Design a protein with these regions (language model features):
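Intrinsically disordered, low-complexity, charge-rich terminal extensions
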Residues: 1-175
Length: 175
């Protein structure tokens, strides 16, 4: 049986490849996301991207943050072999908007901001407000779970090497 720490470090590349693939999907192919959420409007790179290049003797870390920050430095880092370790995502569905950061090494979600809900005007309304908040949290989590499940199936298929990986490389080189 694998030690948890060994397994964690051995497979963290999957989460980082997932985030890199997700950025590619955000830039080039958002239409297929509608199959996971019929009300899907958009998925955008938010206000923070962290990339890391571990191919040299020392790890190089690049952080791009701020509203309206240019992502060209991130593309340049991808060209040099970096992988995304954190990605802030803006998810829009119907008239609703979520924003959160996804960490590659563990796929932890942090700073999840959900759409605002109605306030409870009486004690009877509290249960409805709580259930609405649970639904809104779950909707963002379900999207990430479905995207990751799709990614893992794609990653172990022949399509990854024959089609998807070359498309990602082409996107990185042409940006």
């Amino acid at each position: 049986m694998l030690d948890v720490a060994v397994a964690y470090s051995r497979y963290q590349f999957l989460g980082e490849e997932f985030l890199t693939w997700l950025w590619f999907v955000i830039e080039k192919n958002q239409n297929f996301i509608k199959s996971f959420d019929p009300d899907f409007v958009a998925l955008e790179v938010g206000n923070r991207v962290v990339l890391e290049n571990r191919k040299k003797d020392a790890a190089e870390r690049i952080t791009i943050k701020g509203d309206g920050a240019s992502l060209e430095e991130g593309i340049l880092a991808l060209k040099k072999g970096s992988l995304i370790t954190e990605l802030n995502i803006v998810y829009k569905s119907a008239e609703l908007r979520w924003q959160f950061t996804l960490k590659g090494e563990s796929l932890n979600i942090s700073t999840l901001s959900i759409p605002s809900t109605g306030s409870a005007e009486s004690e009877e309304d509290i249960e409805g407000v709580v259930l609405e908040k649970i639904f809104l949290y779950d909707k963002a989590l379900q999207l990430i779970e479905k995207l990751y499940a799709h990614f893992t199936k794609l990653r172990v298929s022949d399509t990854w090497h024959s089609s998807e990986s070359p498309l990602i490389r082409k996107w990185i080189q042409s940006s």
